[in-house]
Amino acid sequence: MTKPDLASLEKTIEKAFDQRDGINTATRGEVREAVEQSLILLDRGEVRVAEKQADGNWHVNQWLKKAVLLSFRLNPMEVIKGGPGQSSWWDKVPSKFDGWTANEFEKAGFRAVPNCIVRHSAYIAPNAILMPSFVNLGAYVDKGAMIDTWATVGSCAQIGKNVHLSGGVGIGGVLEPMQAGPTIIEDNCFIGARSEVVEGCIVREGSVLGMGVFIGKSTKIVDRATGEVFYGEVPPYSVVVAGTMPGKNVPGENWGPSLYCAVIVKRADEKTRSKTSINELLRD
């Protein structure tokens, strides 16, 4: 689509969102068409909820998040076929693969292992691999990414090129509050098994998270080499493991419970990453 078309879509979505209390399953016309077109563009990867700028910052297209939210008001619950044992689901969001044949899969160019679930409006780039996993609406999974077994990519999350989300990883979705940005895993990151990155946090390019690392907006991310503490963002090429920090003493005592933190144990640039296995990087 041309820029004027996108500008028109954005204007319609913004106006509709301001008047969302009057929008329901009976709504027809311009609003419904704009929402449906926005979701199709997201599904094709022609637009995305967040885009990285030349300065490294991420610009969030809030109007696309609003389009996703409006779709819940517009669409009724309905039977969705394809459940185990010829059963069905009951939901408002169809599968990305609804009506697909071999032709669509070949054109898309990614691998979808049985029992992976991808909702309509999520984009999956060529050469990505989806093990039995869940990718929520509005998400963007870039080229060569591996979404391993039982991993979850939340709504509007951005997964970069060649990212590996190990088994059971959770990447949080962010639709509301509206001003919040999506959770972002930049290119060439490795996220260890059962780790969680949520609340719109960003893991910068080339970083490695060990198994069981949990990062939210309030999590202290401590650089062991410098003592610097980060919140909400893992710096580029960081190697991060789970750790603890001393807590405040309990009243009347000289001890207190330790508190969870994430620890940057080293920095591994692109050259080091290419020559070193993940297990070696995570050894202290």
Curated annotation (Swiss-Prot):
Homotrimer. It catalyses: (S)-2,3,4,5-tetrahydrodipicolinate + succinyl-CoA + H2O = (S)-2-succinylamino-6-oxoheptanedioate + CoA. Its main location: cytoplasm. It comes from the Bacteria. It holds the Pfam family THDPS_N_2. It is found in: Cytoplasm. The keyword Ion transport does not apply. InterPro entries: DapD_Trfase_Hexpep_rpt_fam, Hexapep, Hexapep_transf_CS, THP_succinylTrfase_dom1, THP_succinylTrfase_N_sf, Trans_hexapeptide_repeat, Trimer_LpxA-like_sf. GO terms for biological process: diaminopimelate biosynthetic process; lysine biosynthetic process via diaminopimelate. Keywords: Acyltransferase, Amino-acid biosynthesis, Cytoplasm, Diaminopimelate biosynthesis, Lysine biosynthesis, Repeat, Transferase. Substrate binds at R111, D148. GO terms for cellular component: cytoplasm. The keyword Transferase applies. Pathway: Amino-acid biosynthesis; L-lysine biosynthesis via DAP pathway; LL-2,6-diaminopimelate from (S)-tetrahydrodipicolinate (succinylase route): step 1/3. Its EC number is 2.3.1.117. NCBIfam families: dapD, PRK11830.1. Belongs to the transferase hexapeptide repeat family. It is an enzyme of class 2 (transferase). This is 2,3,4,5-tetrahydropyridine-2,6-dicarboxylate N-succinyltransferase. HAMAP family: DapD. GO terms for molecular function: 2,3,4,5-tetrahydropyridine-2,6-dicarboxylate N-succinyltransferase activity.
